[in-house]
Amino acid sequence: MVNFPPEIQCFLQLGENFSLPHINTPILTIEFIKHIECNLRKLSPASRIPIREKLKSIIKNIPSYSFPRNSHNDWLTRLYLTAKNFLQNNKDLILTRADKGNVTVALDKFDYLNKVGDLLRDENTYTIINKDPTKKLISNLKELLSRWKNHGYISNTTYKSLLFTDGILPRAYGLPKIHKINIPFRLIVSSINSPLYSLALFLHKIMIKNFPTASSHINNSFDLVQNLADVHLDDDSLLISLDAISLFTNIPTDLALSSVSSRWSFIRDVCDLPESEFLSAVRFVLNSTFFTFNNIIYKQTFGTPMGSPLSPIIADIVLQDLEEKALNTLRFTPRG
């Protein structure tokens, strides 16, 4: 049991988004460039050049910039250094955020690895892969994009923006559900900078912009209140709420492809890809469910890949189809 000094607790309660005073200019410069380049990837190569030119002078001036000093910044800097030293001396601790709520959680590293490991030991959902599939993924991606470019489906600029030649596999981590008994974990997979991230985002943008939303779609709680304002219920009416458990890992690939294919008419005129090529790319992304945790490579054996930009829209349209089919089987008309 580790006892956290009050000043360490105070510092950690600031949260991960709190802006701390900068004490390491070289690291600040590198991080600044990394964030800029990460966002520039979203633009066309021609658009990146003038932005880089404008940023050159800013980057050059960072080392000579004198950041303001005051008692608050000095106090925060001392707290930061104290907390950093404390964590370096307690390497069995892991800091993360809670699954819900703006809360920083300190975990025992052994317990964290065990609990996340328990999730990954579900043989019906995950399997360990002995050989790194990254090179094969990149090779298959290049083959797909080259075929598209050679047939004139995409431009050379789009080809370059979608091709990842040095990507890494998606990375998994766990977030504690501190609001539940025994504090179970939610498995999260981050696919940013993975080989198929840009392709998945490309497909996602086409679908999200053109697929119609369900008539039952609610944007937020305010929209819900507005929709319910004029609904009058009888005394014997029932209000039900349904929750999907582990949605992404329970959607069959063939069902996902069927839902996309049935909506092809909405994107046919705005997409230069033939339906067969578009569906082939969707299948490629959905079947590439590799990720790493604690230096072990896993493959999700069923469902849509967690962490992929493509999975949310796929889950949405599959649920739309399920909702429509379920409502059509009812012997009465539900209200709402």
Predicted regions and their residues:
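Beta-strand-loop-alpha "switch" segments that mediate conformational coupling across diverse proteins
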Residues: 203
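Conserved polymerase palm-domain catalytic core
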Residues: 206, 216-218, 222-226, 230-336
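Catalytic nucleotidyl-transfer cores of nucleotide-processing enzymes
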Residues: 191, 195, 237
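Short helix/loop capping segments that flank catalytic or ligand/cofactor-binding pockets
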Residues: 104-106, 115-116, 183-186, 197-199, ...
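Short, solvent-exposed loop/turn segments at secondary-structure junctions
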Residues: 180, 195, 245-247
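Conserved catalytic motifs of the protein kinase core domain
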Residues: 171, 184, 235-237
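Non-catalytic, polymerase-adjacent accessory regions of viral genome-replication enzymes
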Residues: 1-172
